[in-house]
Regions:
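Non-catalytic signal-transmission and effector/linker regions of two-component phosphorelay proteins
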Residues: 1-23, 36, 124-143
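Conserved acidic carboxylate
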Residues: 26
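Two-component/phosphorelay signaling modules centered on CheY-like receiver
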Residues: 29-47
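Acidic, metal-coordinating helix/loop segments flanking the phosphotransfer/catalytic sites
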Residues: 48-67
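Short amphipathic alpha-helix used as the core "switch/output" element in two-component signaling
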Residues: 80-92
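Alpha4 helix (beta4-alpha4-beta5 surface) of REC/receiver domains from two-component response regulators
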Residues: 81, 102-119, 130
Length: 143
């Protein structure tokens, strides 16, 4: 007897023709690994980083990313600084905050500092997927 697929998104992949790179910056190892695995399962090219310094290094040395998914509180700085630096460097990216800071004032600060979306921890994977698919549609229409 076949076992049912336990994945919350069986057989779902990004839109055809869209090859999006995602930088995941999260200091909590388990969270980073789960997000990285989920995004890769969905078919995205993922570059994980565990700190502000590591995230900035990846932005500088790796191929351009389409999406930054970052925690706000990092051991050596903030996701605000990461997105701010990406924007200063002229990077046109979709920036998604993933944080335990969920008060309306926290969401407002994230928006004012350059984030396009703010997701609370634990992450609503359905909502994250919808955001990424919207970006994929936009990328597909722009090409």
């Amino acid at each position: 007897m076949a076992r049912p697929n336990s994945s919350p998104f069986p057989n779902q992949m990004p839109f055809q023709g869209v090859n999006m790179r995602i930088l995941v910056v999260e200091d909590h190892q388990d969270t980073r690994e789960v997000l990285t695995g989920l995004l890769r399962r969905w078919g995205y090219d993922v570059s994980p980083a565990d700190s502000l310094k590591s995230g900035l290094n990846r932005l500088e040395t790796e191929p351009p990313v389409d999406v930054i998914l970052s925690d706000i509180a990092l051991p050596d700085g903030t996701g605000y600084a990461l997105v701010g630096e990406a924007r200063r460097r002229g990077k046109r990216v979709l920036a998604i905050a993933l944080s335990g800071y969920v008060y309306p004032s926290d969401v407002r600060v994230a928006t004012l500092t350059g984030f396009d979306h703010h997701l609370s921890k634990p992450c609503d994977c359905h909502y994250l997927r919808a955001i990424l698919e919207d970006r994929a549609k936009w990328e597909n229409a722009a090409s």
